[in-house]
């Protein structure tokens, strides 16, 4: 987890987006043991702590000096709004650091430049969202 590698907080997913939506595919294994061992973890909210938690989580490994909250899967439907969630979390983090008078570094990556992208209906088929559309031709 990023929070045991120098980050104070992390909110997001650890996989490329199509790995997150694979469990929704018709041919994805339905066996709960398979999903528990190989399925993607959800959207995670993690915080570094000073307390060493020796618990070994079957999905995350040794917890260590952090807290880990799985906020749920990154489904195709949630992908429509995940950038809103992560942007809100980033702004909240920055505001808290400013209010505390602490210097900070915020690494914020949205999902819109990645393959696969699922957007809300009102954002579909808008000019400029599809590569090549509105590009001058030679």
What residue ranges belong to the model's regions?
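Formylglycine-dependent
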Residues: 1-102, 110-124
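A short beta-strand-to-alpha-helix junction
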Residues: 76-82, 128-138
């Amino acid at each position: 987890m990023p929070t045991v590698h120098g980050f104070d907080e992390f909110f997001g997913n650890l996989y490329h987006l199509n790995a997150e939506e694979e469990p929704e595919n018709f041919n994805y294994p339905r066996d709960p043991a398979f999903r528990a061992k190989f399925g993607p973890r959800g959207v995670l909210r993690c915080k570094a702590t000073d307390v060493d938690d020796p618990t070994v989580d079957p999905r995350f490994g040794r917890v260590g000096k952090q807290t880990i909250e799985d906020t749920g899967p990154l489904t195709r439907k949630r992908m429509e709004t995940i950038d809103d969630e992560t942007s809100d979390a980033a702004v909240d983090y920055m505001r808290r650091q400013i209010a505390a008078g602490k210097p900070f570094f915020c690494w914020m990556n949205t999902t819109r430049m990645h393959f696969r992208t699922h957007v809300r209906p009102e954002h579909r088929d808008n000019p400029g969202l599809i590569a090549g559309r509105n590009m001058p031709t030679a």
